[in-house]
UniProtKB/Swiss-Prot annotation:
Assembly and oligomerization: Homodimer.
Species this protein is from: Cupriavidus necator (strain ATCC 17699 / DSM 428 / KCTC 22496 / NCIMB 10442 / H16 / Stanier 337)
Record's keyword annotation contains Ribonucleoprotein: no
GO cellular component terms, A-Z: cytoplasm
Claim: Transport is one of the keywords in the record: no
Name the UniProt record assigns to this protein: Histidine--tRNA ligase
Regions crossing the membrane: none
GO terms of biological process kind: histidyl-tRNA aminoacylation
InterPro entries: aa-tRNA-synth_II, aa-tRNA-synth_II/BPL/LPL, Anticodon-bd, Anticodon-bd_dom_sf, His-tRNA-ligase, HisRS-like_core, HisRS/HisZ, HisRS_anticodon
Amino acid sequence: MTQSENVAAAGGAKTEPKVRPAKALQGVKGMNDMLPADAPLWEHFENAARAMLRAYGYQQIRTPIVEHTQLFVRGIGEVTDIVEKEMYSFTDSLNGEQLTLRPEGTAAAVRATIEHNLLYDGPKRLWYTGPMFRHERPQRGRYRQFHQLGAEALGFAGPDVDAEIILMCQRLWDDLGLVGVRLELNSLGQAHERAAHREQLIKYLEGFQDILDDDSKRRLYTNPLRVLDTKNPALQEMAANAPKLIDFLGEESLAHFEGVQRLLKANNIPFKINPRLVRGLDYYNLTVFEWITDKLGAQGTIAGGGRYDPLIAQMGGKPAPACGWAMGIERIIELIREEGVVPDAAGCDVYLVHQGEAAAQQAMIAAERLRDAGLDVVLHASPDGKGGSFKSQMKRADTSGAAYAVIIGDDEVAAGVVQVKELRQREQAEGGGQQATVPAEGLVDYLIDAMVGASE
């Protein structure tokens, strides 16, 4: 006899199997959600950035998140950390192509410039923003999915544009109210100058093989410049005394670097020359720079860039000079929080309270008319679909951040009026601002006049 038959024979009811709740799924480690509470701060940064980029005449470009892997191998450099161990790459099961989630934005912007012949009528100033992906250990300020803002000045050779892209960053820091962000500067010269320096640098580093860490040993003969960028405390003295690339620069490279410095000084931009600053990508030449803060711990670089004149030709385009920068948006958002310059979250203009079937219909009509006039309106809706009391709705209106509550009940519908209550006049007596009865047809004009008056 089965268990259910035993239960039935005993006169008991059949027991339904206990259903376990499904386990909640979570996001991928290092790939974070941006929640509604964070949105105003992101929008604040994005609005400031867009305004700055417009002020300098930059145009937006958007490229795919997925590119051919070879784009980054050729563009970033085969022996860089990004290409060797940080890229999310996969084989397309449909056609066998090797594809990669973009780890940075410059290579794709240059690819698009070449593919669409954007330089046919002269130099271009372009900017981009979006998510990038690197397979690394997540920590504060370093994520597997992160967001970049970048600017690329393509077709410009002079030190004036190097200086201008640095000034752009300073203007953004000023607009965001950020202080204590310092600029470090260096020149990587040209390829033949780096080759002469590389030869001497390898000879120097070979004398320290007994203390080099694994990363430095791996880079010794493939990318020795990156050894100078080591964060290992035991190697700092060695790196500080290494041959300096700036001592190998010829007249033209030195003149370019001095031109950049002269323009920065003329615009009152303080900077420090850091001969060990090399950046982590192989496409740079001449000017390189980083903006650094001490308020974010080890991940203190919030923006960096420089000149990359060889890259366009290296990727198959007609040779053209170029320079640019990229900044990590998450790190800047964190710095804004650290410095306490977070803007107040903006509420909507109107919260529409209603009770009764006829009132609900009129409230929706009124909300659409207000939106037609350019106002931001939240129309009350309750979780249970029953509306809720006027008291509970007014609490929602107050916590929404709205400047005004518009109140409609069936009595107001019958009389052809609405009630308008000020919610943000804190100098008024406790309980909020004034309340007025307004003809329904005149609601839009009344609120616009009231809001204009409040802003004067």
